[in-house]
Structures are given as C-alpha cells and as structure tokens.
C-alpha cells in the first residue's frame, strides 16, 4: 500500500475497498468515500435513508459524516470518539458506534465510485473573531450577560441530530439551551432552538428553557419566539481574537 499523502482508487473492488478502509483506520488517516448507499441510524431515535449518491467522511478522531449534494450540514453524523469498522455482508457496510449514549450508524455501500485515504498533518487551531464561538466564550467568561445566576456547562453539546451552542442551568435549576447567532436571527434559528428544547423536555419535562442570543432578530422570528414560549437576549459578538478553551463541567 502506498504511503503517499493521498491514495485514491476509483471503482474499487471489494478487496481494494477493505484494504483502503483498514489502512485509513489503522493509520488514523482521513477516509473519504463517494458511493451509492443506504443509511440506518439506531439510537435515541431511529431513522432510515434510502438509496442515493453521497459523500462519506471518516476523520481520525472518529467523526463520521454523511453528506448529500445539498445543504451544508451532514444528513447523518457521529461525533468524535465513535468507533468505526467495515463489515462484509451482502454489501460492504461501514459501521460507526458511539458508546455513550449508545448510537449506531450503518452505511450500506451499494456501489463505490471512489475511495481515498488522506494522511493529513494539521496541528493548528482556528482563531475566530466575532463569531458564535467568540460569543460562547464571552458567555462562559461572563455568564451574567445572559442573566444573573446563569451557569454555562457545555459548549457544542450533541442533542438529537444537532448540536446546542451552549447548554447550562439557571438559578432555579432549569436546563437552559442557548442558540447563538452572530448576525440578525431569523425564523430558522427559532425553529432550531425549539427542536432542541422539545427534545430535552421529553426527558426532563417543563424545566427546560430556550434562549436565542443574537444582536437582533427579525419580526417573524420575534413572533415565533413569543408563540413558542422561548426567549431572546441581545448580545453583540465580541471583536477580539481568542484561542482559549473553556473547561466543560457536568450537567448533573
């Protein structure tokens, strides 16, 4: 097997596919597959995605992403720390398992158009200015910009099929979900916040609050917030560079 930075095989045989996938996992390289596939997810919920052409990316940290030919976000994904393996069934199946909470993502590879292994070296960190990441850091440094007694606990917390920007508790012990926007917030942001709150309320009841944090919001977003019983906090993204990493605490 070549040890070049990149190894690419188009229309690989099953043996070539197995060899490249195992090589990527063993070498902790980045694996990319263009394929026609089906996807099955089993975890807190269940979902099925029928046959279609997609891009599958497996990163050295265990991140597992499945992209369609539209939208920015993956249609299915698993977070860092997940374990990945290839199983030979009727068709080859990529399996990603998250241990806690237990979640399994299976991708049946019906036809593989291309598989690549990228032996990437990248040790830099991104310094974001005026972004949602900077807003989150400001909130961790000064929680009272949200409200007195607010205690932020998690950043980028996986909830269902999405990621909450900041998760914490208020002075009354309620769980608080923060959806951060560095620009004017629109209806989509409210709907996203609503979905996170609904997921958490299924488990924790009414002791869950949702707060949209942004410099401003549209009139439609304001009406929907009020209708859904959600809240708004005005906050401008800070204009500074930072690479600090906040320590995350436990929610319970």
Swiss-Prot record:
> What Pfam families does UniProt report for this protein, alphabetically?
NucS_C (PF01939), NucS_N (PF21003)
The cellular component terms of Gene Ontology attached to this UniProt record, alphabetical and capped at eight, are: cytoplasm
Q: List the InterPro entries hit by this protein, alphabetically.
A: Endonuclease_NucS, NucS_C, NucS_N, NucS_N_sf, tRNA_endonuc-like_dom_sf
The organism's superkingdom is given as Archaea
Compartments, as annotated in UniProt: Cytoplasm
Enzyme Commission numbers on file: 3.1.-.-
Alphabetically sorted, this entry's keywords are: Cytoplasm, DNA-binding, Endonuclease, Hydrolase, Nuclease
**MF-aspect GO terms:** DNA binding; single-stranded DNA endodeoxyribonuclease activity
Q: Respond yes or no to whether keyword Magnesium is given for this record.
A: no
Which Gene3D superfamilies would you find in this protein's record?
A: 2.70.180.20, 3.40.1350.10
Q: Which family does it belong to?
A: Belongs to the NucS endonuclease family.
What is the role of this chain?
Answer: Cleaves both 3' and 5' ssDNA extremities of branched DNA structures.
Q: Mind telling me which PANTHER family this protein's record contains?
A: ENDONUCLEASE NUCS
Q: Supply the HAMAP family for this chain.
A: NucS
Q: What is this protein called?
A: Endonuclease NucS
**Source species:** Thermococcus kodakarensis (strain ATCC BAA-918 / JCM 12380 / KOD1) (Pyrococcus kodakaraensis (strain KOD1))
């Amino acid at each position: 097997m070549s040890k070049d930075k990149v190894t690419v095989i188009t229309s690989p045989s099953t043996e070539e596919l197995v060899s490249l996938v195992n090589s990527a996992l063993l070498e902790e390289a980045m694996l990319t597959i263009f394929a026609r596939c089906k996807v099955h997810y089993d975890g807190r919920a269940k979902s099925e995605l029928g046959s279609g052409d997609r891009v599958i990316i497996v990163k050295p940290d265990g991140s597992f992403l499945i992209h369609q030919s539209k939208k920015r976000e993956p249609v299915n994904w698993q977070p860092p720390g997940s374990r990945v393996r290839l199983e030979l069934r009727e068709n080859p199946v990529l399996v990603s398992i998250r241990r806690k909470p237990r979640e399994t993502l299976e991708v049946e590879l019906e036809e593989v158009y291309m598989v690549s292994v990228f032996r990437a070296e990248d040790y830099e960190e991104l310094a974001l200015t005026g972004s949602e990441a900077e807003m989150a850091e400001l909130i961790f440094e000064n929680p009272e910009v949200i409200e007195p007694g607010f205690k932020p606990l998690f950043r980028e917390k996986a909830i269902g099929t999405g990621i909450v920007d900041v998760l914490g508790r208020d002075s009354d012990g309620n769980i608080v979900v923060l959806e951060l926007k560095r620009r004017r917030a629109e209806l989509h942001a409210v709907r996203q916040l609503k979905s996170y709150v609904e997921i958490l309320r299924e488990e924790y009841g009414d002791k869950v609050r949702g707060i949209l944090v942004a410099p401003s919001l549209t009139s439609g977003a304001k009406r929907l917030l009020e209708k859904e019983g959600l809240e708004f906090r005005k906050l401008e993204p800070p204009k500074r560079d930072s690479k600090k990493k906040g320590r995350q605490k436990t929610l319970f």
